[in-house]
């Protein structure tokens, strides 16, 4: 006899598994304001994802992109973006066009900024992008810094502080290594998933 005693649905039912290109297109085609979570299996997959996304948004959509890596250095991100099928002229977009910003996640999340000031700086980034004639901003931030600092509850609080939908021309893309996501409790996972408009696994 099948008795429903109110257990929640499995978490994976709320997460869409896609290949890298489809996942990138899903995020790219979402409206400004979207708050997305992307869980990635390894660095190679992540690099392919952000390389595809950055090329499309910078070259085709006239957007400013901020990448906030944790499991690789700023220079290794530049190297990944300048090589492979989806390569771009990193120096041109980073220095000349001011469309690419790469900031280490420990600096962004544990530097001088608080959670509140980090959000304020994102709003300022959108304002500056608009003044340059850009369509908007995408921020791809790796949440690994919180796990490195053993501040899991702080990570959940940070996610819940951010709006589920931004009221500015920005896409917030929270990147989670699968092993970091696995460290969250079931309740924490559910809160984080529910707070994002789109949850993807690549």
Task: Show which residues each predicted segment covers.
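Non-catalytic regulatory/interaction regions at protein termini and inter-domain linkers
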Residues: 1-202
């Amino acid at each position: 006899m099948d008795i429903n005693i109110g257990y929640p649905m499995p978490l994976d039912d709320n997460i869409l598994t896609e290949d890298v290109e489809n996942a990138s297109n899903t995020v790219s085609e979402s409206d400004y304001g979207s708050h997305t979570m992307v869980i990635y299996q390894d660095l190679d997959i992540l690099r392919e994802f952000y390389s595809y996304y950055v090329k499309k948004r910078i070259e085709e959509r006239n957007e400013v992109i901020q990448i906030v890596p944790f499991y690789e250095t700023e220079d290794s991100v530049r190297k990944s973006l300048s090589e492979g099928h989806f390569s771009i002229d990193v120096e041109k977009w980073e220095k000349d066009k001011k469309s690419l910003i790469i900031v280490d996640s420990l600096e962004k999340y544990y530097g001088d900024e608080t959670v509140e000031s980090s959000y304020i700086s994102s709003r300022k980034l959108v304002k500056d992008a608009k003044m340059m004639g850009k369509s908007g901003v995408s921020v791809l931030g790796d949440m690994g810094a919180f796990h490195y600092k053993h501040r899991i509850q702080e990570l959940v609080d940070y996610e819940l502080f951010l709006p589920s939908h931004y009221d500015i021309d920005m896409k917030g893309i929270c990147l989670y290594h699968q092993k970091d996501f696995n460290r969250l409790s079931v309740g924490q996972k559910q809160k984080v998933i529910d707070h994002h408009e789109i949850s993807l696994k690549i």
